[in-house]
């Protein structure tokens, strides 16, 4: 994809990152004390049973209760905290597509004359389309690793895929599903380690009317699950977090939390909802009659 002109328009470069690298960096930041902020303790394996938005109290499945000034529900597409928001009883569901995910060493692709031409350019995202399926490839980890998303009709891998992130996929099945693609692309797919291929259903959800209630606010996929066709899920979640940090300054009185969360919702809801809609449009099958609104 040639992004020179769009980068001039938006004034910001398009950055591609390996998700685990981003996770590790964020973890280091929050767990490392500085002169300005103490280290933040992380309590893993703490499954939520319910949330009281009015008192900002979380009850864990083991009965432990934790109370604070505000609860931020950033618990993903299968969010429990969403259910404490009026109108938030929606569930994400598959809309007909699944995706294989896997990594390939760029050196391995470059060393093969059949696949080298597909990966020779630095920092290039490539998409290969079929009418109802597509393969997305982009570099991560300083151009040393190629990250793949192979989107296809859900029915063709239904016996393997589910709604979790760790479901193992079958390399041979993937190659069969994309058998109509160029042989060089299939050779590139074949370089995936058979044990590293994952597959899951792509989930979407109707728009919820509000992201906040009393002293609870939603963030990221808990508020707006995105289909992956623009690669915006992580970026918009970070935007949510930055916006929340602005409206909830360090010395915000508890009595003002509700109004501040309403402001957060007003700032973020329309933008995220629009990106959700554009992601759906871009993900539509290429039938020749689905055009994005030029406006």
What is the predicted function of each stretch?
Residues 72-73, 100, 137, 174, ...:
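Conserved mid-domain beta->alpha element of the FAD-binding
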Residues 27, 31, 49, 82, ...:
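Amphipathic alpha-helical interaction motifs in eukaryotic regulatory proteins
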Residues 1-105, 157-160, 167-171:
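Conserved N-terminal helical subregion
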Residues 283-295:
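C-terminal domain-closing interface element
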Residues 46, 117, 121-123, 131-135, ...:
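FAD/FMN-dependent oxidoreductases across multiple families
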Residues 49, 56, 66, 79, ...:
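Glycine-centered loop/turn positions within well-structured domains
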Residues 107-114:
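Short helix-loop capping/hinge motifs at secondary-structure junctions, enriched
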Residues 91, 124-128:
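Short Gly/Pro-enriched turn/cap motifs at secondary-structure boundaries
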